[in-house]
From Swiss-Prot:
EC number of the protein: 5.4.99.12
GO molecular function: RNA binding; tRNA pseudouridine(38-40) synthase activity
CDD domains: PseudoU_synth_EcTruA (cd02570)
Gene3D superfamilies: Pseudouridine synthase I, catalytic domain, C-terminal subdomain (3.30.70.660), Pseudouridine synthase I, catalytic domain, N-terminal subdomain (3.30.70.580)
Protein name (record): tRNA pseudouridine synthase A
Gene Ontology process terms (BP): tRNA pseudouridine synthesis
Residues that hold substrate according to the record: 134
Subunit structure and binding partners: Homodimer.
Protein role: Formation of pseudouridine at positions 38, 39 and 40 in the anticodon stem and loop of transfer RNAs.
Classification of source organism: Bacteria, Bacillati, Actinomycetota, Actinomycetes, Micrococcales
InterPro entries in the cross-refs: PsdUridine_synth_cat_dom_sf, PsdUridine_synth_TruA, PsdUridine_synth_TruA_a/b_dom, PsdUridine_synth_TruA_C, TruA/RsuA/RluB/E/F_N
Assigned protein family: Belongs to the tRNA pseudouridine synthase TruA family.
Length: 288
């Protein structure tokens, strides 16, 4: 970020069904690519559009109601946003940014900016975050299987023991190496602090898994859910989740669940005065 640039926070929601994930990829429709194309249209960019930095790089098919990103805009771009449009009075830049991005995305988009604000000093959508909270939906034999929810719910044929799943999930909390539940990436740590993990049934009998951590490694949430489903089916005991975790290597004892059941619900940040300090702390490598 240059000294003259202004940073904006964008709160974003999307249905991930038709996206190849968040991250921009050549010749594939992604959330980042779609939003950056909208920015390029607004600012008439002939080269690289303003780049988005995101709190959580969701995989293909994963949804979000509470994704957070930031974008740095030049003084000229901010002035363009503030410029009166038609009969409108001069606009607040953040209001105009939200309105114009959503205008480019169309009347019935599968991604939109739900809020735009000028970011406080020190804010970084990725590194300032304290936690990310996800929800996973599973319909089993006794749950209502609603065709209208098929794009955001995983289905399993058996009846699941939600109490056993909840006990297994609770035992996973804390700072640990989750290599057994992560897809390996060279140079990336698999040490995470799991802050919340629980299971319950909603009014329609659908199982809702809620999981929060300081950060998640690749496929970690869906692997954790897959292990819990094995517990719910009686194929694993609740305590086996900890045993598998402590082995620190991928196993065939459970399957990674489908992306469609997963939604990023919320990203949490500290008070404004702590944003910069949190970002510096997070950039350091996690250790046990």
């Amino acid at each position: 970020m240059t000294d003259q640039a202004t940073r904006f926070r964008l709160d974003i929601a999307y249905q991930g069904t038709d996206f190849a994930g968040w991250a921009r990829q050549p010749d594939l429709r992604t959330v980042q690519g779609t939003l950056e194309e909208a920015l390029a249209t607004i600012f008439r960019c002939s080269g690289e559009p303003p780049s988005l930095t995101v709190a959580g790089r969701t995989d293909a098919g994963v949804h979000a109601t509470g994704q957070v990103a930031h974008v740095d805009l030049s003084p000229e771009q901010v002035a363009l946003l503030r410029r009166p449009h038609g009969k409108r009075e001069p606009q607040l830049a953040h209001d105009a940014l939200k309105r114009r991005v959503n205008g480019v995305l169309g009347p019935v988009p599968d991604v939109l900016v739900s809020r735009a604000t000028e970011a406080p000093a020190g804010f970084d959508a990725r590194f300032s975050a304290l936690w990310r909270r996800y929800e996973y939906r599973v319909a089993d034999r006794i749950a209502l299987r609603d065709p209208l929810q098929r794009h955001r719910t995983a289905w399993v044929p058996n009846t699941l023991d939600v109490d056993a799943m909840d006990r297994g999930a609770h035992g996973m909390l804390g700072l640990h190496d989750f290599a057994s539940y992560c897809k390996a990436r060279e140079g990336a740590t698999t040490i995470r602090t799991l802050q919340a993990f629980s299971w319950r049934r909603d009014a329609e009998g659908v199982l809702l898994g809620e999981v929060a951590a300081d950060a998640f490694c690749h496929s970690m949430v869906r692997a954790l859910v897959g292990a819990c489903v094995e517990v719910g089916e009686g194929k694993l005991r609740p305590g086996d989740l900890v045993t598998l975790r402590d082995e620190r290597q991928r196993t065939s004892a459970f399957k990674v669940m489908p992306a469609r059941g997963l939604t990023l619900r919320e990203v949490g940040y500290p008070v404004d005065a702590e944003l910069g300090r949190r970002a510096e702390q997070t950039r350091g490598l996690r250790t046990l």
